[in-house]
Structure formats: structure tokens, C-alpha cells
Amino acid sequence: MYDNEAIVGQDVAESGLRREDVFITTKLCQTRAGYELAWQGIEESLARLQTDYIDLLLIHEPYDEALDMYRALTEAYRQGVIRAIGISNFNAREYLDFIGSCDVIPMVNQVECHIYYRRKELQQALVTQGTQIQAWSPFTEGKKPIS
């Protein structure tokens, strides 16, 4: 999605670090929408990252095909290919609608969240259902002072 998986995989391989000491998160975007394409995306990410598992895999946005994508993630999670599965950029309504059809509740919802955009309704929905919030812009992308 961000065209950085190959370099991350190479750097981890060359770093001398043990794989279990590095936490790798990546995402599937719309070009991998749907069940089959999601599986293809998982396999491609594993190859580019030069690893046999991904620590956290997210669906980038609430695409129309997100449930089909998530079904592939769920199967990969059950097989141990992905250690944690989640979503990104789902608001409270989208999240609650989505989890109504999930066998495994997303472990993470990665969203914009910071002092100026606290997402209280979303945070409450996530806490109630057992999903962790992960901020993708905790310091407002440097656009506003936080002191």
C-alpha cells in the first residue's frame, strides 16, 4: 500500500534482529478488495516482507468488499499467518455495522486520533467491544501545537 514492504523486509533480514523482536504492521488497500484478492495481497505482503507471518494486518478503509477481505484475514489469523487482524479508518457506525458480521472482532481500529480529534464516540464503541484504538496521527502530523 505504501510501497515500503520490500525495504522493510530487506532491512529486517539484514539487521541481525530476531524476527520475534520486530513488530510488523501492514495494510491491504482497495486493489486487494474481495476475498481472493485479499489472500493474494496477504501472500504478496509475506513475500515482500520476507517473513512467514505478519504481526498486524489492517484493512485500510471501510470498502464495500471489506467483509470479504476480512474473511480472508480471519482465515489467515486462524492459520497463524497473521498474529492480529484489524481495520483502519472505520467510524463508530461503520465499526458497529461491520462487527455484526465478523466471526473474530477486529483487534485494532487504526484511525486519526489526537488531542484535537478525540473520537469519543468511536473510542466508547471500541472499548465496549474489545477493539483497541491505534492513532495514525497522535501528534496531529505536526500541523498544530500540542503543548
Regions found by a protein language model. Give the residues of each.
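Short beta->alpha junction loops/turns
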Residues: M1, S15, Q30-T31, P62, ...
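N-terminal binding-site loop/beta-alpha segment at the start of enzyme catalytic domains
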Residues: M1-V22, F139-G142
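Short beta->alpha linker loops
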Residues: Y2-D3, Q30, N89-R93
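Glycine/small-residue-rich loop that forms an oxyanion/phosphate-binding "nest" at active or ligand-binding sites
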Residues: A13, K27-E75
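Alpha-helix termination/capping residues and helix-transition junctions
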Residues: G16, R48-T51, Q79, D103
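Short acidic capping loops at alpha-helix termini that bridge into adjacent secondary structure
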Residues: R18-V22, D52-L56, R83-A84, I105-V108
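Generic beta-sheet signal
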Residues: T25-K27, A135-W136
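Beta/alpha (TIM)-barrel catalytic core signal, keyed to glycine-rich beta->alpha loops juxtaposed to Asp/Glu
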Residues: E61-S147
